């Protein structure tokens, strides 16, 4: 399970070191293999352990090829999906098109979402989280969805 937001750096070759606390799980359950693709609604990447990525692929493949919206979703998400493998130093390499989509430069945020990570440029992340908090502070924010939710 991946939780929390961690500041990380992209090196000159387009690699990022996965924080040590996550490496054992990724190595043990997925042999260090992950799948990265674009988020279709946000300027970030989605980084899944390989087994979770396979589950997402099955869902995408189940969509209709005859529905234009579903076909676009398949094209974008599967077309950008790239298998990545952690190297001996725990780094993952992001391809040029993936880095371009998320506007990745040196400073990044690795954001745990339990079953996956979101990868954000630090600038985009801070803008997005400020907007999310502002919207979340309104009285009617997701009121129906949160009626039965408790922490």
From Swiss-Prot:
Domain SpoVT-AbrB: residue ranges: 5-52, 81-124
Gene: mraZ
Cross-referenced CDD domains: MraZ_C (cd16321), MraZ_N (cd16320)
Annotated protein name in UniProt: Transcriptional regulator MraZ
Subunit composition and interactions: Forms oligomers.
UniProt GO molecular function: DNA-binding transcription factor activity; transcription cis-regulatory region binding
Gene Ontology terms describing biological process: negative regulation of DNA-templated transcription initiation
Annotated keywords: Cytoplasm, DNA-binding, Repeat, Transcription, Transcription regulation
Compartments it resides in: Cytoplasm, Nucleoid
Similarity annotation: Belongs to the MraZ family.
PANTHER family hit by this protein: TRANSCRIPTIONAL REGULATOR MRAZ
Entries under InterPro entries matching the protein: MraZ, MraZ_C, MraZ_dom, MraZ_N, MraZ_sf, SpoVT-AbrB_dom, SpoVT-AbrB_sf
Gene Ontology, cellular component aspect: cytoplasm; nucleoid
């Amino acid at each position: 399970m991946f939780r929390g937001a961690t500041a990380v750096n992209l090196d000159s070759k387009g690699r990022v070191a996965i924080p040590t606390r996550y490496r054992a799980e990724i190595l043990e359950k997925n042999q260090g293999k992950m799948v990265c693709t674009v988020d279709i609604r946000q300027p970030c990447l989605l980084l899944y352990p390989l087994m979770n990525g396979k589950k997402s692929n099955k869902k995408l493949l189940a969509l209709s090829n005859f529905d234009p919206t579903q076909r676009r979703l398949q094209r974008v998400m599967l077309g950008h999906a790239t298998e990545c493998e952690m190297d001996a130093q725990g780094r993952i390499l992001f391809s040029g098109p993936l880095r371009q989509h998320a506007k990745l430069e040196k400073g990044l945020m690795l954001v745990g979402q339990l079953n996956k990570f979101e990868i954000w440029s630090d600038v985009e992340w801070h803008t997005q989280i400020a907007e999310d908090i502002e919207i979340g502070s309104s009285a009617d924010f997701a009121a129906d969805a949160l009626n039965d939710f408790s922490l």
